[in-house]
C-alpha cells in the first residue's frame, strides 16, 4: 500500500509500530539530509561532484591516497558538526523503549550513535568516517592525527607507524569487500524482527539492499519510507513517500 497522504501514512505507521514486538530500522542517506549531509545519488549529490576513488586506486597510488584524504577532510569541514535529525531521534526513542534492538545503516556519519544508540547496536555496513584504521594491522587512528601528519608533510598521506601499512578512513570504498562481521550481524537482525523499516535508502546497493526482502520473506512486515520510489515498493506492506523527519517526528520521546 502506498500511503495517499501524510496523515494516512502516520496513522498506519503508528499502528504498525504499536503492534510490533521487534522493529529493525535500515537507514540510508535520506535520513541524514535534513542534518545538512547531502546524499550520493540525487542531482547535486556527492557523486555528481566527484567520481569516487576506487579501492584498488587507493592501494596503488600515493596520489590517490592523498586525494582521498583531501576529500575526506573537506567533507568533514563541511558536515563534521552535523547533529542527529528527527529521524535519528525517533529511532533512538524506539531503541530506549526496547522496541528496536539495533539499527542497520548504510550511512557513515555516526549520527545514530550520536542520537544515543550504543555503538555495539549500530551495524555499519559501509563503515564509519569519524576515525581511521590501518588496512594491515587494524590500528585505529584519529582523524586529527592524520590531518596533522599530512599538514606537516605537504599533503602526503601518512603510513602506519606500527607496520607501514596504508591508513584509510574506516569506511568501505568502492571495490572494497563488505565487512563480513557487519553483514552477518545485519542478517541476524533482519531475521529477528516482525517489522522492518527501510528509511531513506534507494535500495539499489547490493548486497545491503537484500535485507528488506530477507526480513519480508521471513514473515516481517515491511515499511519503506523514502521520497523516491524504490524497486521493492511492490513488496512493501506500507510505502511512505513523504519527508522522513516529518513522518518519524511523532515517535520522538524526550
Residues covered by each model-derived region:
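Conserved catalytic core of sirtuin-type NAD+-dependent deacylases
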Residues: 1-254
